[in-house]
């Protein structure tokens, strides 16, 4: 009986962890998409330096959309 209770507790904790992780990932994804939309709609079109636009084009073409370096590359080029 004790083993069954322990197994059920571990199973419930595992399920709860998976649910919470999924919720956090969805929230992070939504926030990142909002930031990328802001970059695409306001900051990138208004940048005047050719290097910033060139870096954005290269990052968009060569890096996967979920690649963490892509976001930091865009932000660093816009801040210059």
Swiss-Prot record:
SMART domains: 14_3_3. Gene3D superfamilies: 14-3-3 domain. Disulfide bonds: none annotated. InterPro entries: 14-3-3_dom_sf (IPR036815), 14-3-3_domain (IPR023410). Belongs to the 14-3-3 family. This is 14-3-3-like protein 1. It comes from Pseudotsuga menziesii (Douglas-fir). The lineage of its organism: Eukaryota, Viridiplantae, Streptophyta, Embryophyta, Tracheophyta.
């Amino acid at each position: 009986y004790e083993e069954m209770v322990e197994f059920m507790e571990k199973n419930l904790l595992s399920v709860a962890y998976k649910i919470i992780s999924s919720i956090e990932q969805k929230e992070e994804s939504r926030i990142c998409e909002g930031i990328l939309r802001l970059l695409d709609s306001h900051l990138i079109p208004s940048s005047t330096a050719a290097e910033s636009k060139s870096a954005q084009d290269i990052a968009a073409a060569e890096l996967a959309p979920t690649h963490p370096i892509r976001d930091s590359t865009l932000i660093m080029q816009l801040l210059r």
